[in-house]
Amino acid sequence: MKNSAKKMVSFLFVTSFALGQNSVKTSNLAAVANGIPIDTLSLSPSSEMLDEELYWSIVENSIKETKTQEDQEIYLIAKIEKLTPKEMIGFRLRTDQLLFDTYNENLWCAAYIINGGCSDGGFEYFRCWLISRGKEAYYTVKNNPDALMNLVVKGQENYEFEGFWYVAMNAFKNKTNKELFLYIDYDTFVTNDENYPVLDFSWNVDQPKTMEKICPVLYKNLWK
């Protein structure tokens, strides 16, 4: 009787384990069938940025392959979707780093002149637009805001790209059905908008000459 009971317990344990394993396999297969990469099921928060050269190659190919900002946004999302979930997070983190590195009063002055005004949000989307213009444009303007004059397009009134801010999040959501920000290790990755420095502005829109001092070329050609 005892042996029979032991055999029954063993049978139930093995059966339950097997069913559990099959359930996991079924869930994983369902996830893959729905376009959710299996590695997101155990994806840990990350602070690792995407390789910078890979990042810029994606951005610069988007410039070459599209003619409008809307098409560029669609292109970027499609290309980011082809990355691994961790790389998608890395794309967002690399963007955050580039935004962080250009959060300064001189570039804000340039953005104000070129756009005829610039709020907090507008400055964020202006820098997204700058990133979307490629590596050379980004670093040239980062070092010399007046170089923005070389990117001015006749007839264009707005130099912002709000959609760029969301491309990695949208791609991640499309492929994993999860929110990208839940997988960022904020304890380690601190170069984000929550930690922007407090700026001490030396220019004032009510005193235009202070803006001219920072961006003489932009001021001369665009200030009205």
Where in the sequence are the language-model features?
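Short, hydrophobic/amphipathic alpha-helical patches that form generic packing surfaces
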Residues: W56-N61, L93-Q97, D101, G121-E136, ...
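N-terminal leader/targeting peptides and immediately adjacent processing regions
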Residues: S23-P85
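Hydrophobic/aromatic-rich, well-ordered segments within soluble, folded domains that form packed cores
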Residues: Y112-K142, L148, V153
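An amphipathic alpha-helical core segment
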Residues: L151-F201
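Long, solvent-exposed, polar/charged low-complexity segments
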Residues: N28-P37, S42-S44, W56, L180-K224
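Bacterial Sec-dependent N-terminal signal peptides
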Residues: M1-N34, T40
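A glycine-rich, hydrophobic loop/mini-helix early in the fold
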Residues: I77-G117
